[in-house]
Regions:
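A short beta-strand element within the Helicase C-terminal
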Residues: 130-141, 166-168
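Conserved segment of the helicase C-terminal RecA-like domain
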Residues: 156-184
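Conserved helicase core region in the C-terminal RecA-like lobe
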Residues: 50-51, 118-124, 144
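Conserved Helicase C-terminal RecA-like lobe
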Residues: 1-116
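SF2 helicase motor core recognition
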Residues: 109, 120-134, 154
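Conserved small/polar residues in nucleotide/adenosyl-binding loops
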Residues: 189-191
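Phosphate- and divalent-cation-binding pockets in alpha/beta enzyme and binding domains
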Residues: 55-56, 130, 148
Length: 191
């Protein structure tokens, strides 16, 4: 227990989150490049957990992206998502399928297309979404399965995409597990 408490205390002393800072820099630079290319200012950020998703939303909102973010996960029960769905449902009666989960997905995609710059998603968005209006995919966390990377990229790299899809992969080079996963993915699918 003493050892665990030592780790907890060390974690609390961390004042700088270099990975999130790097994400912020990557977004700013990528949005600049998108503007030069005439592409929409859109980014799809994938993460493995809803806790990281919530943290990234909070961090990005505190650093210039307030009101420009939509979350996509398997739950979809946060107040903003519920409000997005309610507004979409009332404004788009002809699009309503009657299948609530499908309608929620459509509402979030429409909101991302029309109102948000950034969608932060878990693997729930890895399949079945058409986001060809977005040309930036950020893999904040890398999954072990190369097929999941291809599915993530495939959300934006679809028929109707008018711009090259840029993929940013985050790898902590000081973390052996991250480097190992990246090297495996690199050898299998050349990301």
């Amino acid at each position: 227990i003493e050892l665990l408490q030592t780790f907890i205390n060390k974690a609390k002393q961390i004042k700088q989150d270099s990975k999130s800072e790097a994400l912020l820099q990557a977004l700013d630079k990528s949005f600049e490049m998108q503007a030069k290319e005439g592409a929409s200012r859109k980014a799809l950020i994938f993460t493995e957990s809803t806790k990281t998703q919530a943290y990234l939303k909070e961090y990005l909102e505190a650093n210039g992206y307030e009101g420009k973010i939509v979350l996509f996960n398997g739950r979809g029960s946060d107040p903003k998502t519920t409000q997005i769905y309610k507004n979409w449902y009332e404004a788009n009666p002809s699009k309503v399928s009657g299948i609530k989960s499908a309608d929620r997905r459509m509402a979030l995609v429409d909101y991302f297309r029309e109102s948000a710059d950034i969608m932060i998603a878990t693997e729930a968005a890895g399949e079945g979404l058409n986001l060809q209006f977005c040309s930036l995919v950020v893999n904040y966390d890398l999954p072990w399965n190369p097929q999941r990377i291809e599915q993530r990229i495939g959300r934006c790299h679809r028929y109707g995409q008018k711009h090259d899809v840029v993929v940013v992969n985050f790898v902590n080079i000081r973390n052996y597990a991250d480097v190992r996963v990246f090297n495996i993915l690199l050898s299998l699918i050349h990301i």
